[in-house]
Amino acid sequence: MKRHLNTCYRLVWNHITGAFVVASELARARGKRGGVAVALSLAAVTSLPVLAADIVVHPCETVNGGTLVNHDNQFVSGTADGVTVSTGLELGPDSDENTGGQWIKAGGTGRNTTVTANGRQIVQAGGTASDTVIRDGGGQSLNGLAVNTTLDNRGEQWVHGGGKAAGTIINQDGYQTIKHGGLATGTIVNTGAEGGPESENVSSGQMVGGTAESTTINKNGRQVIWSSGMARDTLIYAGGDQTVHGEAHNTRLEGGNQYVHNGGTATETLINRDGWQVIKEGGTAAHTTINQKGKLQVNAGGKASDVTQNTGGALVTSTAATVTGTNRLGAFSVVAGKADNVVLENGGRLDVLSGHTATNTRVDDGGTLDIRNGGAATTVSMGNGGVLLADSGAAVSGTRSDGKAFSIGGGQADALMLEKGSSFTLNAGDTATDTTVNGGLFTARGGTLAGTTTLNNGATLTLSGKTVNNDTLTIREGDALLQGGALTGNGSVEKSGSGTLTVSNTTLTQKAVNLNEGKRKLTAVCSHQTRIGNLDAHLI
């Protein structure tokens, strides 16, 4: 017997439905008071571990505990507390063909429900479910309101049109689908991205075909916004990501990633330290702000407008993209194959493609300017730690980090200085004069070295075919590598300062090869002449 308010309730046998039902003490069985009806061995009934089929919880009634199995139904217009639901999904997730489960009807409330394997809780319009735990493949279908639902181990929540989920927590392998017209607020997503950034995985995490507001995406969490979906005020931490095919507004990247695909739109995105926004071909972003150590990447065919690039923020793009905004130099743009006033630092990069141009480019520490064969960049300003990638088929002019002018054009490279990470390729028939390599890579595919070519600590000179040196190749303090091909002509190779010059699989035909200081390591080398200038210098 169950007491609620001032009324007693009993389980009585319904001869019409052939099942036990909850009844008031005033209810009659075949014209008799309920006290007579309970003579049907009530003790045996209450010892059963499951509720009877088709239990009805009427308005103002409260039922505590119980288990639904084997296509049992519980229809709740009152309150059901602590029920375990293990039936209702036998025919597949969110299928109308299913029978059984717990039905929270208009005005009804389900509290502290546990939905397990094959279990289903249906919250109809006007119904409310709170503090539900869904696990092991169980599901919750919402046309009403669900508050503080937890999805564990393949637990699923389907928010239909008119339904609302507030405060859902999606743990490992959990899955929330917000369908068109559905709303989810305050969701915490802890799963979906275990396979890595933007891996093909749609079996866990949050899928948005309706509206998602104030979602928090933690490590391993993923939110996928379908073309019909919209997300607002999303917070994404490191290891979490958001895939946008629809709309994303006011997203904050605190180390997390946002990928905007063809047809997708992102507005008012804030990229903080280690955050990364990627605009793919056909994707669009507006009003993105890049703060220090944040990164905006706009791929070929992508578009980002009204970008604010603050000091220390990184822009990664090419002249095949469209990007406009402001940086510390003022307004900048990359439009129709022309880039102007771009700042590259902290992982920023600009690729200038063949037939395209860049003007007034600033390349500071951690920034990279890549000018492809047939591309042109003028008024380039290289700062300390800036990286230049080019070959002798490009056209480049500007100043080095030490303030000296350099240029590439017409098959002639003058006064290049290649910092660590930089690379220059000298094509056959072209000439490089007075090149300095400070930890970068200088590749000569034939051509001629003129003036003084200097290799400093960490530098590599790679030869392919025959390269002519009629002047001086000097290796100063530190270690350097000369490898491959052949170096011919009437020039000289000079090693000075401490460190080791490694010469590997290279044929040297020079007027002189002088090891004045340090060490030289030879591997499969033919040398016309070698002279050791002092007793401290030696071959190894």
Protein language model regions, located:
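Bacterial Sec-dependent N-terminal signal peptides
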Residues: M1-V45
